[in-house]
């Protein structure tokens, strides 16, 4: 059974979390308008100006991290020394590293998915339905959840956009993570996990509590699927044989979730904490 190792209190609405190669935890504070990191047990934060940009999704890279501000219409980069830089973007939300060293991000309100090459040039794909989270698979296929479109989109390496409607109406897909055989995603409003194959075939897996409101999902190196249950304040685990177990979390509203290099997990509780969990 998973075990809570520590709880770090952080005000300001922790939302997204990511862990870099050294084990440093980076996070966004959506309510405060800040980003931060946890270094040797010490919380360090960097205020953003203006503070109402809603920093949400964050991705560690090198000595810093990238993050999105969908209300601020920009993508930020924070360095280990606290230095900030920004790129202009239209309502960015989901963010991931591209195989060519560039970035992929979603335009939550503008109905687009954008690839930013290492040289700064951008290619935009029109993808309606409130594109939310995004992830690129090893073969270059990009998966995107369409929260209002009730679908999952795939962008092939040659740039074709293919969309698969979900079997359950009004499922509200959000969180997404790639796996060896496609991608896993959560259905916030239907209380289900979903899996999409590389060919677009979708299967759905109901949770024990259909009102749990799953939000974020990650896939561990061993293939275990972990997910947060926003309404139920729990961390869920699905093993390869389909068994689901759940761990009650302190506080409320778990959002972001990340796997550390040592295999432990971090959960962002929007009620004001970062929770460290042993699998």
From Swiss-Prot:
Gene3D superfamilies: YVTN repeat-like/Quinoprotein amine dehydrogenase. The keyword Lyase applies. Its EC number is 4.2.99.-. Substrate binds at residue 215. One of its GO terms (molecular function) is carbon-oxygen lyase activity. Transmembrane segments: none annotated. It holds the Pfam family Vgb_lyase. Its cofactor is Mg(2+). The keyword Lyase applies. The active site is at 255 (proton acceptor). Keywords: Antibiotic resistance, Lyase, Magnesium, Metal-binding. Mg(2+) binds at residues 253, 270. InterPro entries: Streptogrm_lyase, Vgb, WD40/YVTN_repeat-like_dom_sf. GO terms for biological process: antibiotic catabolic process; response to antibiotic. Belongs to the Vgb family. Monomer. Inactivates the type B streptogramin antibiotics by linearizing the lactone ring at the ester linkage, generating a free phenylglycine carboxylate and converting the threonyl moiety into 2-amino-butenoic acid. This is Virginiamycin B lyase.
């Amino acid at each position: 059974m998973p075990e809570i190792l520590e709880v770090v209190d952080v005000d300001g609405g922790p939302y997204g979390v990511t862990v870099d190669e050294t084990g440093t935890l980076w996070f966004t504070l959506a309510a405060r308008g800040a980003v931060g990191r946890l270094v040797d047990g010490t919380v360090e934060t960097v205020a953003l100006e203006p503070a109402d940009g809603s920093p949400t999704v964050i991705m560690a890279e090198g000595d810093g991290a990238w993050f999105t501000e969908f209300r601020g219409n920009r993508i930020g980069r924070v360095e280990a020394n606290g230095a900030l830089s920004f790129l202009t973007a239209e309502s960015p939300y989901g963010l991931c590293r591209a195989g060519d060293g560039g970035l992929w991000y979603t335009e939550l309100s503008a109905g687009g998915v954008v690839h930013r090459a290492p040289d700064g040039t951008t290619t935009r794909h029109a993808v309606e339905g409130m594109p939310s989270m995004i992830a690129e698979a090893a073969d270059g296929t990009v998966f995107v959840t369409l929260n209002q479109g009730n679908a999952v989109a795939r962008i092939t390496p040659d740039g074709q956009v293919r969309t698969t409607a979900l079997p359950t109406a009004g499922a509200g897909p959000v969180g997404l993570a790639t796996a060896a055989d496609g991608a896993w995603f959560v259905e916030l409003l239907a209380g289900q996990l979903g899996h999409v194959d590389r060919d677009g075939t979708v299967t759905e897996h109901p949770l024990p509590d259909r009102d749990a409101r799953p939000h974020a999902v990650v896939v561990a190196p061993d293939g275990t699927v972990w997910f947060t249950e926003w309404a139920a304040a729990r961390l869920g685990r699905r093993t390869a044989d389909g068994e689901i177990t759940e761990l009650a979390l302190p506080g409320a509203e778990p959002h972001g979730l990340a796997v550390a290099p040592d295999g432990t997990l971090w959960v962002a509780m929007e009620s004001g904490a970062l929770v460290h969990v042993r699998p």
